[in-house]
Structure formats: C-alpha cells, structure tokens
C-alpha cells in the first residue's frame, strides 16, 4: 500500500511542476487534463503526508520511551504522546485504504434520472412524483442543478414517467444506489375505506456520457417534432418545439419537451440518448464478462425492490443493507444523506473484502 502511495505522491509533485510550466498553461486541453488529475490525487496525497508526519512522531515517542538514558518524567511524557498518536495513525491508515479502493470511473459525472410509475396505476404515478421531488430537494441540499427533460403527467398531478438531469460534482457517486424498484405503502387520498395500498415506481440513474465515449451518427437518428403538453394533456406550446429522437440501430426512443426552443429540446434529448446508449453498452459488457461486480450493492437490477416507504408508520427501509429510519417525511424532503452514506460504507466494506 505504501509503495503505491509513494508513487502517487511523486506523480502529484510532478503534476505541480507541469502546471507551473508556461507551455502547459497556454494549452487549455493539457491544463484541464493535468488539473483534473491533480485534483483527484489531492485528498489521498495530503492524507498520506499527514500519515507520514503522525507516524514519524509516534516512532520518535516510542524511541524516547525505550531510551533508558532519559529520566522517568520524560519517558512518561513519551508514553502519553504515544497513547495519543497511536489511534490517529490507525485511523489515517484505515482512511488511506479506503481512498485507494478502485474508483467507479463514472462517479464524478452528472446524471440523468428516469422515474416511472409502475404497479399501482394513479397511486404509482403520484409516488413517482414524490420521488422526483425527493431527488430535486436532495440535489438542492448538495447545491446541484436540476433540469427537467421530459414529463408524462397524469390528471391527478403525478407522472407516468419523468426524466431529469442533475448537474453536480460527484452526482453519480451518490445517486447510483437509487437504481431499482421503490415501493410505497399508504392509504390513497381517494380511498374512503382507509385501506393501505402498495404501489411501486422504478428509478434508473444513468451517468452522463460524453461524445467521445458514445459517438452517435445522426444518420442513424430519426427526429420528429410535436407540440408539447402539460398536466392532463393540455397543450402548453402552440409551436412544434417538442422533440422525439429514435435511434434506429438500437430502437431507443427519447423525448424532450421542457424547453420552448426546439434546438434546446434536441440537445437535451441527445444527452439522454447518449446516456442510455452508454448504459446499454456497459450492461452488455458486464453480461459478456458475466461478472456484475460482487462489490455492488444488490444486483443493480432495475426490477429489484430496493426500498420501501411506509407512510402509516413513517418508516423507510432499505432492503439491501437492512437499514430502517423512522423519518419518512424528512427523507421525502430530500434528507437522503443517512441512507446514501450507509450504502457507500457498505460498498466500501465489500470492496475491502475483495481486495484482501
């Protein structure tokens, strides 16, 4: 581990020198590339330096304790110093092991989220709306930007499906765990008998793909335009500004009608199409290797039930890690940190097991 950390520190110092080179400063591509690499190494290198400093202080204190030429008072001070430093050294070492775990190459990317009402009709569509609000509020808490891409509204104010983009550093690293089926248990407002109904909505979280990762030949894409519509199907725009893209080789279809400009809708739809194709390529690659990461939380299957939201008991349960929280209202208000942090820790523990 420490050999690897030493190599990373050398590379970090090399990058510092390169970023001070006028030739690099005048080349925007190299400057961006080296700055990004340096930023990725920053936390690990700074923690490694802190570890070396603390570890050295511990060794010096130990040496003083073992030095019989020193008086008892000095050796007692050295012992106290050791007792203070030992847990700090162990904690820093544990943190460094986590920082060296394999990184998901998509973790720093923006995401495209698709929420669909599944089993449960109108109630499932309303729940899809609740999930959309939950994710937008969570994004606000992270200072991320949310852009609505496409929405298929129901008359009661829910969504048959809604697609939106979240722009923010590390968005995929936190939201990737939301892939799967979400179940709700509650008494519908239209239910006079007070019976609890169970409905589901599915969530797909796709990392935004760059053009260099997925190149789409526009000859393979059919572009249709139509009039955008809002809740209840009413027209909200008299111009043909909404765009539907059909990728002929894969059969994937993407719509976008949120913007008033046809050009902007087409750009947004292309982002979704590129993300879906990237996701499809990744899935096919995983199947070919027949090795979806054992370290992943659950199977990542979008049909897998990952979480239950129980309204009568104000309870949220994540079935993958057996976590139950008695604060449903706060979770739906975007307070997802406790759940996401627990899922990240669980994934790290699995990766540590695989590395041993």
Swiss-Prot record:
Name of the gene encoding the protein in the UniProt record: prfA
Subcellular location: Cytoplasm
Residues that bear N5-methylglutamine: 234
Primary subcellular site in the record, as a coarse category: cytoplasm
Pfam families in UniProt: PCRF (PF03462), RF-1 (PF00472)
Keywords: Cytoplasm, Methylation, Protein biosynthesis
Function: Peptide chain release factor 1 directs the termination of translation in response to the peptide chain termination codons UAG and UAA.
GO function term, MF aspect, one: translation release factor activity, codon specific
UniProt record similarity statement: Belongs to the prokaryotic/mitochondrial release factor family.
One term under GO cellular component: cytoplasm
Post-translational modification remark: Methylated by PrmC. Methylation increases the termination efficiency of RF1.
HAMAP family: Rel_fac_1
Lineage: Bacteria, Bacillati, Bacillota, Bacilli, Bacillales
Protein name per Swiss-Prot or TrEMBL: Peptide chain release factor 1
NCBIfam families, per the entry: prfA (TIGR00019), PRK00591.1 (NF001859)
């Amino acid at each position: 581990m420490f050999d690897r950390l030493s190599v990373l520190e050398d590379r970090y110092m090399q990058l510092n020198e390169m970023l001070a080179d006028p030739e690099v400063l005048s080349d925007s591509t190299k400057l961006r590339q080296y700055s990004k690499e340096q930023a990725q190494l920053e936390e690990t290198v700074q923690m490694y330096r802190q570890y070396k400093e603390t570890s050295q202080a511990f060794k010096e204190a130990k040496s003083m304790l073992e030095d019989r030429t020193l008086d008892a008072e000095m050796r007692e001070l050295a012992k106290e110093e050791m007792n203070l430093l030992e847990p700090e050294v162990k904690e820093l070492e544990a943190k460094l092991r986590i920082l060296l775990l394999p990184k998901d190459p998509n973790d720093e990317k923006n995401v495209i989220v698709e929420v669909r009402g599944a089993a449960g009709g109108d109630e499932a569509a309303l729940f899809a709306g609740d999930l959309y609000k939950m994710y937008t509020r969570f994004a606000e808490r992270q200072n991320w930007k949310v852009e609505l891409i496409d929405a298929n509204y129901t008359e009661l104010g829910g969504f048959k499906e809604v697609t939106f983009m979240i722009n923010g550093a590390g968005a995929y690293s936190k939201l990737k765990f939301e892939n799967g089926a979400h179940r709700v248990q509650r008494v519908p407002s239209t239910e006079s008998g007070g019976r609890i109904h169970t409905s589901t909505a599915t969530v797909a979280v796709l990392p935004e793909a760059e053009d260099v990762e997925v190149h789409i030949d526009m000859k393979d894409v059919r572009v249709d335009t139509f009039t955008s519509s809002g809740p209840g199907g009413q027209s909200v725009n008299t111009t043909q500004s909404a765009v539907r893209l059909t990728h002929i080789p894969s059969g994937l279809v993407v719509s976008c009608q949120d913007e008033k400009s046809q050009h902007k809708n087409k750009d947004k739809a292309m982002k979704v199409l590129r993300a879906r194709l990237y996701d499809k390529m990744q899935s096919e690659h995983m199947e070919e290797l027949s090795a979806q990461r054992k370290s992943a939380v659950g199977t990542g299957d979008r049909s897998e039930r990952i979480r239950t939201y129980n309204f009568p008991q104000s309870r949220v349960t994540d079935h993958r890690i057996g976590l139950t929280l008695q604060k449903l209202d706060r979770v739906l208000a975007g307070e997802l940190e406790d759940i996401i942090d627990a899922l990240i820790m669980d994934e790290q523990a699995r990766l540590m097991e695989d590395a041993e």
